[in-house]
């Protein structure tokens, strides 16, 4: 958060399915390669490391609204995106089709950033277009964005 900004809203959504899939992948690599017998090779070590990193980076999605900025990031700060509130031209709560999945992907509605569930907030951002950010609290996020955009009396 930049100096002088006031945090108005923050929520971290945990992607239980993505986290479980990552852990499952680690177990498959570990036990499927005979590592429990002490036979973990270079490829197996790389694959295990890949699943550890992937799980750590994409198992949570945090959204923040300050008095000036909307930002979100995966895991401990990976893939951080930030937009000035003045550039947000529209906000609405949406439901994504199940086939949109999770992660970072381009859809018919613009970029989607999601770790769990089907609910999201769709933002129309000047010079960026439309993006969707998944959240377990879409109404609260929409309200926080709208309130933060109101002029201070």
Where are the regions that the model predicts?
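Conserved beta-hairpin
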Residues: 49-90
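Short hydrophobic/aromatic segments of transmembrane alpha-helices and their interfaces
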Residues: 45-46, 53, 123-124
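Hydrophobic alpha-helical transmembrane segments
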Residues: 37-47
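Non-transmembrane, membrane-adjacent beta-strand/coil modules in membrane-associated proteins
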Residues: 73-136
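N-terminal membrane-targeting/pre-transmembrane regions
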Residues: 1-37, 112-113, 118-120, 128-130, ...
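Generic C-terminal helix-cap and adjacent flexible tail
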Residues: 147-153
